[in-house]
Amino acid sequence: MSKKHNQTGEAAMSESKKTSYLLLSRTDEWYKQLSHAELQKIIADNHAWVGRLIAEGKARPGVALAREGATVSGNNRAVLDGPFAESKEVIGGTLVLDVATMEEAIAIAKACPSLRHNSTIEIRPISDECPLEACAREKAQALATVNA
């Protein structure tokens, strides 16, 4: 959220509230067959797109993710090589948007240059609480209502 300063210098929240959205870029390894020049063009297009969003105050710098990784799952804490052992698709990078609506986040995602190469962009609102915490809060509120 942006802040404005009033005449006394106190920070006041601007009228336009922003929500943060996480963009997850999913892709397979389509790029391995491209020439160096083709790769450089795609990289430049993506950097320009992200740079514009950051300059407009709509995004924060994201992170690129390595292909390698591990997955730990279940009660037995099974460890599998790779972030998505059952899939050839991987999350290649992330970007956090700070925009007013999901519709604006979708419009921004639709402009991602990587989509021309069959990448997928998943858009998720960033929440102040995880689903487990939200469920516990809702159940506590329901119990308080019943016991009131």
Short names for language-model regions:
Residues S2-A148:
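Conserved, structured core segments of small domains
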